[in-house]
Amino acid sequence: MEEKHQEETGELTLVLALATLIAAFGSSFQYGYNVAAVNSPSEFMQQFYNDTYYDRNEENIESFTLTLLWSLTVSMFPFGGFIGSLMVGTLVNKLGRKGALLFNNIFSILPAILMGCSQIAQSFELIIISRLLVGICAGISSNVVPMYLGELAPKNLRGALGVVPQLFITVGILVAQLFGLRSLLANEDGWPVLLGLTGVPAGLQLLLLPFFPESPRYLLIQKKDEAAAERALQTLRGWKDVHLEMEEIRKEDEAEKAAGFISVWKLFTMQSLRWQLISMIVLMAGQQLSGVNAIYYYADQIYLSAGVKSDDVQYVTAGTGAVNVFMTILTIFVVELWGRRFLLLVGFSTCLIACLVLTAALALQNTISWMPYISIVCVIVYVIGHALGPSPIPALLITEIFLQSSRPAAYMIGGSVHWLSNFTVGLIFPFIQMGLGPYSFIIFATICFLTTIYIFMVVPETKGRTFIEINQIFTMKNKVSDVYPKKEEELGALPHAILEQ
């Protein structure tokens, strides 16, 4: 009886905890690390670009050409992320979730070696190519890790474990900021080491992850290997009797037989998945277009205007990164208590208020002496709000609102939206800042407001529900009679259990 109760509630076993940590550290950590790794040593890297150009051509590089090369260095990362997102469906269907993560380490170890040797080889081209490769790595990992952990976790731990990838992204950013202090590796000799360290987590994952189970859902639904799926569940749960969870996966398999293989194109045309698709696109776009990258872009300027010495800005920036890590840890503990929907509403609302107040503070900072301090508070409040909901929850929800056959295609679309939005903000924000000045954040406040309204009106709470139950909630919105109806019929008489939800 006790074992049956354990199966219904689920526990954080040692195997599940280690699988989560190894997957997140080996993949998500690299994403965060490579976001921040080039920021601190940028002036030394650009000097290296100039010196290399001079050695080849016996003249200094033109300012425009240097700016173009550095823009390529930075923008190759989100562009690679977009390419990586397009590869997700094929990789997870052919290699499995765990197999895709192991394969993905190629896109980390190879560029780590190239970046580490770039100074010796006198080639800035190696850095630009490597930034594309680590971007591909981040694009794959940002989609596959939440999918893998969401399929490993029991439903009562799915939210907490689903936030862990975002935690390791923030830890990766913080570690890059700390290693990127001038006194450590952000200097003339240390920057190749700083860039090359991204290969260390990949190497550890390559050594350790093979000893942990593949996703039981992938094994049963896609590989049709019930024995392997049951063994994987028993290893993850720590007990032999997993028949209730196996039965739930079988029901999901039965529900999906009518749909068959779902490609990206088919996902766009299926009425039974329409509102799941729209919700995913809104959340992934809202996550990036809410201004998170712009806040970090503007942060140094805000700190300087508040009187922080230029040499000390790096420490304040690292402090902001520490706040981000702390709030993401807090989210792990409250996501199963407060739910996904509530955290999204609170997070986007907090970002909305922070953007509005920041706009006023920036507009008045030359008039009122203490306004720069309000700006600093706004940056910190924004980081807190984004860490509570907009950063960690959207990727978790993709796992929850789609079933096994549609999940890879959903992650391809969601990941593509994420990286294109990221790239767009990075590309156009400097021009928005030039045109609107302190009023730039009105645009992000508007996006936060619209996203909050959408979440309130459309996105359901998924806490504590099975994947089938969550998809049944959407049947009424989609005006279909079942999760995957054989014919996309208009909504008729729905089962009473669905109407109650």
From Swiss-Prot:
N-acetylmethionine found at: M1
UniProt keyword annotation of Transcription regulation present: no
Transmembrane segments: 18-38, 68-90, 98-118, 126-148, 161-181, 192-212, 277-297, 313-333, 342-362, 371-393, 412-432, 439-459
Residue ranges, Cytoplasmic side: 1-17, 91-97, 149-160, 213-276, 334-341, 394-411, 460-501
Record Gene3D superfamilies: MFS general substrate transporter like domains
Catalytic activity: D-fructose(out) = D-fructose(in)
Regulation: Fructose uptake is inhibited by cytochalasin B.
Topological category with respect to the lipid bilayer: Multi-pass membrane protein
Family: Belongs to the major facilitator superfamily. Sugar transporter (TC 2.A.1.1) family. Glucose transporter subfamily.
PANTHER family (alphabetical): SOLUTE CARRIER FAMILY 2, SOLUTE CARRIER FAMILY 2, FACILITATED GLUCOSE TRANSPORTER MEMBER 5
Protein name, as recorded: Solute carrier family 2, facilitated glucose transporter member 5
Species, as recorded: Mus musculus
Gene behind the chain: Slc2a5
